[in-house]
């Protein structure tokens, strides 16, 4: 795959940049660690730029990877606008506010109730005011690992650029015109599975020629190590059938429907308890749905786990 992406780059050792948000516990973040461990560092110099140096997986970054320093402006995106105003980030705060208002208007017009437009607009509206990332470097390949993909497109110099998709686009609400303009500037779009590819192309068929399949990478030694460390948590002590779901608490994962599904299964006479490992913006929604279905004893949120 890398040979295909770098086929026109003549140097012996290639210079790569990977950009992502942070390294909190999550499937995409774990996949990034796997990707970093898979590089042959005799052939590639790999720089990693994170918007924030945060998360439990920071310690998993391979020593051969060059972790670039934080750039203060990019850390603003994760904090409340009111706070960033007090910190003196006036222009970026106003850009975020403009993006928030534009996203709210778009969602209202299209009757979206839980869209990803706000996140996209947060990056889109602040991007013009962000500094360049490694402004003196021209990379052979730059990878934007998590959407939105504006920063690698506009703030990185590279001969080739790839944007990654981890999300099922059949389950999220986006501004198709705006995202089309974002995706079109990339040389390739990396999809983690055939299903993700199919659902992405159902929304963006014009990018069929750009899609390449790069499945999530987990080194064999890492999997063995995690398996040997695994212990069934004391929290999972229910009798009967146990179901475990793991993932980020967001619309695409559909965890908010678990309480109703669990209720229906139990009404049919099956003794099940459903555990949820993860975190995210839908946690309060899931808790509310658990209460509404009266499933407090049978749907249990376990939160973050290092080794689920």
Segments and roles (model prediction):
Residues 9-15, 225-242, 266-267:
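Nucleotide-sugar donor-binding and catalytic loop/hinge architecture
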Residues 19-20, 192, 214, 245-249, ...:
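Short hydrophobic "strand-cap" motifs at the C-terminus of beta-strands
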Residues 18-25, 43-116:
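N-terminal strand-loop element at the rim of the active site
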Residues 141-169:
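Active-site proximal beta-strand in glycosyltransferases
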Residues 29-34, 241-264, 270, 281-287:
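A conserved mid-protein helix/loop that constitutes part of the nucleotide-sugar donor-binding site
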Residues 160-166, 170, 184-226:
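Donor nucleotide-sugar binding/catalytic pocket of nucleotide-sugar-dependent glycosyltransferases
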Residues 127-138, 150-151, 170-192, 196:
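Membrane-proximal helix-turn-helix segments that form the acceptor-binding/catalytic region
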Residues 64-68, 287-305:
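Nucleotide-activated donor-binding/catalytic signature segment of Leloir-type glycosyltransferases, i.e.
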